[in-house]
């Protein structure tokens, strides 16, 4: 998992993905790697805390922020055993799908291009976090 720059480049080869970030969630709640100049590089430690925190009820009702962009949560199985994915959509006219995948040490956050359905990102995140989990074990 050492070469995140190459990993980010590989993920961005998928033309449906506009932005990607790898974010620590256990010891170091910061962005480890992201698309240069991308919006997701601005994910804050507070946002990571909300995503991985025990209070799921509040952000399911009020939404959450990812890199300062307000989002509606569509599906939350981020902390569920065997799934580990949260689907959201940014609010506003330029609404985009956002999908967050959970691994033992990091979150993988993808933002789709305009018009890309969240289900496509969900499948991509499941595939990617499966590979990351295998590397960790």
From Swiss-Prot:
Report the InterPro entries cross-referenced here: PFN, PFN_euk, PFN_sf, Profilin1/2/3_vertebrate
A Pfam family hit = Profilin
Might you name a Gene Ontology BP term for this protein?
regulation of actin filament polymerization
Q: List the Gene3D superfamilies.
A: Dynein light chain 2a, cytoplasmic
A cellular component annotation (GO) from this entry: cytoplasm
The intrachain disulfides are none
Tissue-specific expression: Detected in round spermatids.
Compartments annotated for it: namely: Cytoplasm, Cytoskeleton; Nucleus; Cytoplasm
- Gene Ontology molecular function, alphabetical: actin binding; lipid binding
Going by the UniProt record, its keywords in alphabetical order are: Actin-binding, Cytoplasm, Cytoskeleton, Lipid-binding, Nucleus
User: Signal sequence span per UniProt?
Assistant: none
Function per UniProt: Binds to actin and affects the structure of the cytoskeleton. Slightly reduces actin polymerization. Binds to poly-L-proline, phosphatidylinositol 3-phosphate (PtdIns(3)P), phosphatidylinositol 4,5-bisphosphate (PtdIns(4,5)P2), and phosphatidylinositol 4-phosphate (PtdIns(4)P). May be involved in spermatogenesis.
The annotated subunit structure for this chain is: Interacts with ACTRT3.
Tell me the protein family, please. Belongs to the profilin family.
Protein name (database record): Profilin-3
| Source organism (scientific name) | Rattus norvegicus
Gene for this chain: Pfn3
